[in-house]
Curated annotation (Swiss-Prot):
<dbReference type="InterPro" id="IPR035895">
    <property type="entry name" value="HPr-like_sf"/>
</dbReference>
<keyword id="KW-0963">Cytoplasm</keyword>
<keyword id="KW-0598">Phosphotransferase system</keyword>
<feature type="active site" description="Pros-phosphohistidine intermediate">
    <location>
        <position position="15"/>
    </location>
</feature>
<comment type="function">
    <text>General (non sugar-specific) component of the phosphoenolpyruvate-dependent sugar phosphotransferase system (sugar PTS). This major carbohydrate active-transport system catalyzes the phosphorylation of incoming sugar substrates concomitantly with their translocation across the cell membrane. The phosphoryl group from phosphoenolpyruvate (PEP) is transferred to the phosphoryl carrier protein HPr by enzyme I. Phospho-HPr then transfers it to the PTS EIIA domain.</text>
</comment>
<keyword id="KW-0804">Transcription</keyword>
<dbReference type="InterPro" id="IPR050399">
    <property type="entry name" value="HPr"/>
</dbReference>
<dbReference type="Pfam" id="PF00381">
    <property type="entry name" value="PTS-HPr"/>
</dbReference>
<dbReference type="InterPro" id="IPR000032">
    <property type="entry name" value="HPr-like"/>
</dbReference>
<dbReference type="GO" id="GO:0005737">
    <property type="term" value="C:cytoplasm"/>
</dbReference>
<feature type="modified residue" description="Phosphoserine; by HPrK/P">
    <location>
        <position position="46"/>
    </location>
</feature>
<dbReference type="InterPro" id="IPR002114">
    <property type="entry name" value="PTS_HPr_Ser_P_site"/>
</dbReference>
<keyword id="KW-0813">Transport</keyword>
<protein>
    <recommendedName>
        <fullName>Phosphocarrier protein HPr</fullName>
    </recommendedName>
</protein>
<keyword id="KW-0597">Phosphoprotein</keyword>
<feature type="domain" description="HPr">
    <location>
        <begin position="1"/>
        <end position="88"/>
    </location>
</feature>
<keyword id="KW-0762">Sugar transport</keyword>
Length: 88
C-alpha cells in the first residue's frame, strides 16, 4: 500500500471539475484508491463519494492506493492535483 498526504490550496477546495478529473484518473488504475479527509475515507473512483467530503481550502487529505499499479496511481493523482492548482 502506498499513501501520500497533501494540503489543498485552491480557494474553492475540491469542487466539481477537479473532482471529476481525480475520479477519471483514479478509474484508469486497477488499484483500490481511497481519499481520506477528516477521518472519513471514500473511494476515489466515485464522484459522489469525493464530493460528499466537502474538501475545502487548507484541508489535509491523504490518498491511499493498494494494488499492482499503486505507485503509478499515486503519481498520476499527484500530477492531477498539481495541474488543477489544488496543491503546490
Amino acid at each position: 500500500m502506498e499513501q501520500q498526504s497533501y494540503t489543498i490550496i485552491d480557494e474553492t477546495g475540491i469542487h466539481a471539475r477537479p473532482a471529476t478529473m481525480l475520479v477519471q484518473t483514479a478509474s484508469k488504475f486497477d488499484s483500490d484508491i481511497q481519499l481520506e479527509y477528516n477521518g472519513k475515507k471514500v473511494n476515489l473512483k466515485s464522484i459522489m463519494g469525493v464530493m460528499s467530503l466537502g474538501v475545502g481550502k487548507d484541508a489535509e487529505i491523504t490518498i491511499y492506493a493498494d494494488g499492482s499499479d499503486e505507485a503509478d496511481a499515486i503519481q498520476a493523482i499527484t500530477d492531477v492535483l498539481s495541474k488543477e492548482g489544488l496543491t503546490e
